[in-house]
Amino acid sequence: LAEENLQARIRGNILMTIANKKDALLLNTGNKTETALGYCTLYGDMCGALAVISDLNKNEVYGLGNWINEKYEKTIIPESSLNKAPSAELSHNQVDPFDYKIISPLVEDIITNGYNVEKLVESGYDYEICREIINRIRLFEYKRHQGAPGIRVSKKAFGTGRRYPIINQYKI
């Protein structure tokens, strides 16, 4: 994992250098689901001046890509990107360890709707998955404090609209 994170950080440094040389801003492409789960690397894929899709969950990002292609009646977002298994692409044949069809709505219910474990289980989610995801959201708050500011499109986004302590084993 340390070597994979190093790869992401080197890539981030290269992209920041290119942006700097071109007098441009690097856009961050982290989404709400990955950010919630801490499935991102500080000073790596979290680099950037503006997180343009940070308030869209993983499923919404794919939906947006498909919508763009349909709206413009041509392939702007490559089909290969929209149809492949999600991956951080930090090792050979790596795929993300989450089923985003389940996890993205769960993250939305926790973050946007403020559901607690009891309400989540009532809604049909598995208790253990709920506990795991809530714990990940709590554990990785420190990363979100260091991420690029994002564009808010939901009623509850990470950033100034949602800040929690990062010390003293704070529980959500």
Predicted segments with their positions:
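ATP/NTP-dependent adenylation/nucleotidyl-transfer catalytic domains that generate, transfer
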Residues: 1-172
